[in-house]
Design a protein with these regions (language model features):
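Charged (often Lys/Glu-rich) extended helix/loop segments that serve as interaction or gating elements
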Residues: 82-164, 169
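Active-site loop/helix belt of alpha/beta enzymes
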Residues: 1-95
């Protein structure tokens, strides 16, 4: 007994599935989680505990939780900026989220500082400018060049066709 505590709900966020690229794989895994949440709700009800809130869902999975009939709220938030890693996640039509359902809202402007090495350019956006804990950035609107590595202050861009010039903006 804890008279000052009120049980108000469940937190059922499945964080490790948020960045699963394949839509069908995410759905399969979320269906299993939703089933477990239903079992938990049934158990709570059988014990006389009301569960008004079931919270969970994220940018990569909210459609599954929202349509489950089990969750009362979703916690998606990364969609507001749509980072590159969430952008790589595929929707039900097999398209990247950042090229279908969501659009990028936050960008980093970088300049090319060097093109001394054939097939490679150096830009001024490294680790001090961006986070790479969920993968390297994607160069917006450019499928012909690829950001391949970075140090504290510089990024390396693969430019196989040697198109980039010093002071080009990306």
């Amino acid at each position: 007994e804890a008279e000052h505590l009120i049980f108000d709900g469940l937190q059922a966020y499945h964080g490790s599935i948020q960045h699963e690229l394949d839509h069908d794989q995410r759905k399969t895994e979320l269906d299993a989680v939703i089933k477990k949440v239903k079992v938990c709700l049934d158990s709570l009800a059988a014990s006389g505990l009301n569960c008004p809130v079931v919270s969970g869902g994220g940018t990569g999975s909210f459609l599954f939780e929202a349509s489950s009939g089990v969750y009362t709220e979703v916690q998606c938030g990364s969609y507001a900026f749509m980072d590159a890693d969430y952008g790589r996640v595929h929707n039900r039509d097999g398209k990247r989220l950042d090229r279908a359902d969501w659009k990028n809202a936050l960008f980093i402007l970088t300049s090319i500082m060097s093109t001394a090495k054939d097939g490679q350019a150096i830009c001024d956006a490294g680790l001090k400018v961006q986070s790479v804990d969920s993968g390297l950035p994607v160069i917006f609107g450019r499928d012909d060049i690829t950001y391949v590595s970075c140090s504290d202050e510089h990024g390396v861009i693969e430019d196989k066709q040697n198109q980039l010039k010093i002071n080009d903006k990306l």
